[in-house]
Amino acid sequence: MVKMLVLYYSAYGHMEQMAKAAAEGAREGGAEVTLKRVPELVPEEVAKASHYKIDQEAPIATPGELADYDAIIIGTATRYGMMASQMKNFLDQTGGLWAKGALINKVGSVMVSTATQHGGAELALISTQWQMQHHGMIIVPLSYAYREQMGNDVVRGGAPYGMTTTADGDGSRQPSAQELDDARFQGRRVAEITAKLHG
């Protein structure tokens, strides 16, 4: 059975929802899934004053454990068209894994959340994939295998590179039912392709 990690960073809970949906989809695809988050770097008093969702139940991951999984889906909030610094800080600690080649041929996929529709989602998806490619990981994007993203009948996130959602600047917009379904599809797709590669 495929072992998958869904690893995320979420300040306000948007990516937490997307990560949970991706994990559900991966389980539907036959994977054994672990859901974890990266450590918060913002001081607790600042996070509380900024109304961060600090009661997230997912345990904190450690960089060394990434090698334990066949596939890793990363979900991250974005900052100025890049992954959030919390995720970048976590990934920057994987140099030892890189030196050992511990993630070579593991499967990787990415999802992001932005404040605005044009907040750099595609750039954040691709730049996060770069991190995975430096490790020799095999990227499985959402892609146009997910035909639902071809429609223009409703505003929704998504790109061929990975699933996205928009939170609005104040965090008031929550992931839509369609976006959560899209994340489930991405999780299921990654699980099924990983099973073919590592089964």
Swiss-Prot record:
It holds the Pfam family FMN_red. NAD(+) binds at residue 12. Residues 163-177 have a biased composition (Polar residues). HAMAP family: NQOR. Its cofactor is FMN. This is NAD(P)H dehydrogenase (quinone). Keywords: Flavoprotein, FMN, NAD, NADP, Nucleotide-binding, Oxidoreductase. InterPro entries: Flavodoxin/NO_synth (IPR008254), Flavoprotein-like_sf (IPR029039), Flavoprotein_WrbA-like (IPR010089), FMN_Rdtase-like_dom (IPR005025), NQO (IPR037513). It comes from the Bacteria. Substrate binds at residue 98. SUPFAM superfamilies: Flavoproteins. FMN binds at residues 10-15, 78-80, 113-119, 134. GO terms for molecular function: flavin adenine dinucleotide binding; FMN binding; NAD binding; NADH:ubiquinone reductase (non-electrogenic) activity; NADP binding; NADPH dehydrogenase (quinone) activity. Residues 158-181 are annotated as: Disordered. It catalyses: a quinone + NADH + H(+) = a quinol + NAD(+); a quinone + NADPH + H(+) = a quinol + NADP(+). Residues 4-190 form the Flavodoxin-like domain. Its EC number is 1.6.5.2. GO terms for cellular component: membrane.
